[in-house]
Design a protein with these regions (language model features):
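Short, small-residue-biased leader/transition segments that mark boundaries at the very start
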Residues: 6-21
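Anionic ligand-binding catalytic core segments
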Residues: 161-162, 170-219, 267-323
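Active-site loop/lid in soluble adenylation, ligation, and acyl-transfer enzymes
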Residues: 29-192, 305-323
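Conserved metal-phosphate-binding beta-hairpin within the catalytic cores
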Residues: 147, 246-267
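A long amphipathic alpha-helix within ATP-dependent nucleotide-binding catalytic cores
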Residues: 211-247
Length: 326
């Protein structure tokens, strides 16, 4: 089920994917204008040109701000797949919008607006509506801040081998998908497209940050860890009250013009998080998920796919990502 907070009425709605998008997008549920998009899913570069093209998002310079556009591309294992998932970019943007607003009392974030009326005219088309976010400019910190509340995925594989997750020793006897006694912080480096992120210790994160920001490494590392845990606890409690388990997630932070740590990038989307249904949850095995874990599992089972998904897998991915929508 969806749980969507309409800030105009503060009411909670339970929606299907097709019902949710028009409400979230304020009437921008039209089909994306394919004339504005190249075949590989990258938006046409005419008046505005992306200054950065990530695995899923494209970032445009807007003078004193940035426009971050979420495409319908999907990535897995640090590779961009050949397929697109219809409306995925809209879902990611609207989920981030909700969570940025929900957690603004914990720390500031980079979101300024998701209304294309607040953006240059170039972005006021169906191709960009619902999937674009106007953001503050930040100096991004070179750490991906991962927090795990449940043991699963690569963490479970590591625990089975040596009783640790990213170098953190955990109690004996844990089961797959079991909730951890306390959430654990497992940072990683940020890899370029095609490369793999590297898990690092908290101590190593201090070194990485100190190298780029002399005299501030430990201070920034501590803030990243503490903010990451605080954000996870607040959001996991809310999601649980709506029937969703947030097993783990990733945050990214940057610095504003005054050197303050600010939350950036995306927040608690199916691309950055594992969402499980609370109903039917039981530790001891893998869980059904409302995220792209379904795609990862299919790719593992089909190593010769050349990262090309069949239509039925794409359709199921659309349904699963839609059910996670906030």
């Amino acid at each position: 089920p969806f749980f969507f907070n309409d800030t105009a009425t503060t009411e909670i709605y339970t929606l299907s994917l097709h019902d949710a998008l028009p409400i979230c997008n304020a009437g921008a549920g039209e089909d994306v204008d394919e004339r504005a998009i190249r075949k590989n899913g990258v938006f046409a570069m005419t008046e505005f040109k992306p200054i950065k093209e990530g695995k899923v998002r494209e970032i445009y310079d807007n003078g004193d701000s940035l426009i971050m556009v979420a495409t319908d591309r999907i990535s897995a294992f640090d590779v961009i797949l050949k397929n697109k998932v219809t409306n995925k970019g809209k879902v990611l943007t609207q989920m981030s919008r909700f969570w940025f607003d929900y957690t603004k009392d914990v720390l500031p974030n980079h979101m300024l607006s998701v209304d294309t009326a607040d953006m240059p005219e170039f972005f006021r088309t169906p191709a960009f509506e619902g999937r674009s976010m106007k953001c503050r400019k930040l100096t991004m910190l070179p750490i991906e801040c991962i927090v795990r509340g449940y043991i699963t995925g690569s963490g479970w594989a590591s625990y089975q081998q040596n009783g640790t997750v990213c170098g953190i020793h955990l109690p004996e006897g844990l089961q797959e998908s079991q909730q951890l006694p306390e959430p654990i912080y497992t940072p990683s480096t940020k890899a370029e497209i095609g490369d793999h992120d590297e898990n690092i210790s908290y101590e190593k994160s201090i070194e990485v940050l100190e190298k780029q920001f002399p005299g501030h490494g430990e201070d920034y590392a501590t803030k990243l860890r503490d903010y990451t845990i605080a954000l996870y606890k607040k959001c996991a409690a809310y999601a649980l009250s709506r029937g969703i388990i947030i097993a783990d997630t990733k945050f990214e932070f940057g610095l504003d013009e005054n050197g303050n740590v600010v939350l950036g990038d995306e927040m608690l989307t199916p691309d950055s998080s594992r969402f499980w249904p609370l109903e039917g949850y039981e530790a001891g095995h893998g869980q059904p998920s409302f995220d792209k874990q379904f795609v990862r599992n299919w790719l593992k089972a089909n190593p010769d796919s050349n990262y090309d998904l069949p239509q039925d897998v794409i359709d199921k991915t659309i349904a699963k990502i839609g059910r996670a929508h906030v």
